């Protein structure tokens, strides 16, 4: 009997890793990168934040990704250096450091079951602040991109955090190697 529970638990944990990060409303958030291998000398590639409604009900998201034309996106971006499978260290981040006065005209994105919505994040390399002595990504290393979108208006009185992650590696693409 204990063996059955262990097998069931292992099965559920493997499925959870494949599902990605899903909020309590059934919306899964994932990151799709233009390139998952690039040279450290190249600009950080553009990526998409993808929201997929895997639930059974229609859901609405607060359309707050680019609230101000002249500022960066209203999301948090973090890059972690993957030291081991479990251990990682933050090497770069972008946090929106501006306040927005909310008016009466709020825009929402409606996702029916099975629908998805993509948000293109361009020129993230201009937004990132690198930490540590090297202040850059290093060739030959593996990293994880983590993007966080906080929605406090999609459902009245409910604050949700959507997290998307994607692994990538930085490789030397020099023609002289």
Question: Residue ranges of each PLM-predicted region?
Answer:
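Bacterial N-terminal signal peptides
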Residues: 5-15
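Hydrophobic core residues within well-ordered beta-strands of beta-rich domains
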Residues: 45-47, 117
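Short, solvent-exposed loop/linker segments at the N-terminal edge
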Residues: 37-43
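Asparagine-centered strand-capping/turn motif at beta-strand->loop junctions
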Residues: 49-56
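The feature marks short-to-medium sequence segments in extracytoplasmic or secretory-pathway proteins
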Residues: 62-111
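Short structured motifs
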Residues: 30-36, 102-107, 129-132
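Surface-exposed edge beta-strand/loop patches
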Residues: 19, 113-177
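Proline/serine/threonine-rich low-complexity linkers at boundaries of modular beta-sandwich domains
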Residues: 19-26
